[in-house]
Amino acid sequence: MVEYKFKWKNDGRTKVMIGCGTRPEIIRLAAVIKRCREYFDCCVVYYNQNWDRNLSTVFWEDFELKNTFGEFGPDILVPVVGENLGVTCGNILGRSFELLSELQPDGYLVLGDTNSCLSAISAKRLHIPLFHMEAGNRCKDECLPEETNRRIVDVISDVNLCYSEFARKYLADTGLPKERTYMTGSPMAEVLRMNLDKIQKSDVLERLGLEKDKYILLSAHREENIDSEKNFLSLFTAINALAEKYDMSILYSCHPRSKNRLVKSGFKLDPRVRVNEPLGFNDYNKLQMNALAIVSDSGTLPEESSFYLSIGHPIAAVCIRTSTERPEALEAGDFILAGITTKELLNATDMAIEMKQKGVLGKPCPDYVDETVSMKVVRIIQGYVNVVNKMVWRKDQ
């Protein structure tokens, strides 16, 4: 049984529940959550997939996201982590079904492709209008667990909210209703703009003893890079080669799972690779703005790169993956898809740094610099709750 103190205000406004469960979801939803609290009777549920403070709690504080009790954090915290993936996913389904049954929101919003998004199944079975942000993203790589989650949530959602025309076209080609598929753009520009002053004022370089353009920033945490023995060895051998070639600090913002994998494997990192606790949003972005290059498998890297390009502060963005669900940013020249071998990583990093230094730059991806996304999301939810109830569930109005 899920314990919670939350109660709806019952002030006549539309009741919207937002479900999330990881750091990237908090980041991407930050502006949307604030907008929903402004215009809806809103409840934020956090399915606690990340138990580390630096991967969850600190981000509510970074974005000043307070719950209905005036505290930093969600309205309802739901523990879901079990002894294996099956138990965790079962907990997400069971506990979300319990919450949605009891609270009966008018609409349920999820973003992305994490396991917490599978709570959408509960909303669907309970006939609660379901809205999905980041719909239609595909990298066409079945090795990624997120790819399965994307397909499930896209297909069952009542209204799909896409970042780009690539994503919208993909959903249309698979037969999903065009009349309930909208392109909003990515929420990241709005989030970055909202926190830009805090980012610029961060003293993280001083705290870590770093200087502008004299370090490389690293983030590597994706399942396909960490859990696969072959990929893990290939990637971190390449990272060591990068440290040797550039002979400077590589600051690794390291997730607990990645750190445990390094310890368990016994892999010896080059001494110039500094393993650091996961960094908060403002500190991490300050480091991105001042790094010689950013080497990352994060899905937000293309969007962050596009935003910084739009404000006249380009970054050398190198994506350590073999596929991407953001082809629109690749077309705009906002990042380099590097792969994970030593040759690929060294060549891509050399190119990214040289192009930045010479001013050979891409252009901001239009889908990634829209700062009105939260407004659009709120308006679409308000407009479509009744439409879905009438057209999909045939409920009496």
Describe the predicted segments one by one.
Residues 1-248, 258-397:
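Nucleotide-activated sugar donor-binding and catalytic core shared by glycosyltransferases
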